[in-house]
Amino acid sequence: KSEGTDMMKSISVKIRKGAMAYLKRQYKTVGIFFAIMFFILTVLAAKRFLSPFVPCAFLTGGFFSGLSGYVGMNIATYANTRTANGVRDGLNKGLKIAFASGSVMGLTVVGLGLFDISVWFILLKFVFKLSINDVMTAMLTFGMGASSMALFARVGGGIFTKAADVGADLVGKV
């Protein structure tokens, strides 16, 4: 679908650049948290309090959650002007574009999560022949990594959105 007028395309590029700059900064900050958590989990695994697979499961959970966020941000910024342009031809067309782009994001999150947890299950249960308790511990840690990344994205996204709202209010008043 078309991105619309030249003005819409220009605004879209600026939004996309700002969103990607935000995401890059956020992922650098979250990377520090993940490095610290990986170190802590590795120490616990070395002392045999945890399975040696737990630190890697935590990292892959965070990685796939972050990848979902990156894909979602790209889809959202590309669909933004296409949806606005579609609405010019009727609400139904704009709704279809928005629904399709939102569906892609939802399926990406579920697909990446299912892929990662399936790989972990197959590796741990059938390749390394671990007990089901050890497999479940690693899978729960995968979920902890994914949830940690999602939490940072949620909190950071709320702050980013509020800053954008304040900026829009200031522009509207000036």
Give residue spans per PLM region:
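Hydrophobic, small-residue-rich transmembrane alpha-helices and their short perimembrane loops
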Residues: 1-174
